[in-house]
């Protein structure tokens, strides 16, 4: 574990999980804004506190998860199973996918959802070290005026929008 050898991820689960959930909602509703999830979350080696907090507050026994090769370790699988009771699956059947950018491609392998049921699409939790507010200009719903965000591959995002 990163912070300690304690199996339990949170010291105050109700309060900390509410904080994570609020931060996740803020991030989803304001695309391109960077949120700091500083916390005392105990995660296994290789799993960031940000990714771990998202998994804890968004996944449960009814949430199939895909783990890319880097994250598909016994330690990470056991931690996710212990805290969420989620099961693991392939890209095409997951509700959440965790991985590095290149390992999660291509986007076409994931469930897309529809206009009527957008919740049926997969959510990708991308481990990306070089996050910053410069690069591609973003605008649209949830963004006042515009913002900038360094996307790993702008063309892949544009192509994904047309799926």
Model region roles, listed by residue range:
Residues 1-64, 68-71, 82:
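N-terminal, charge-rich interaction modules
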Residues 74-163:
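Internal, well-folded beta-alpha domain core
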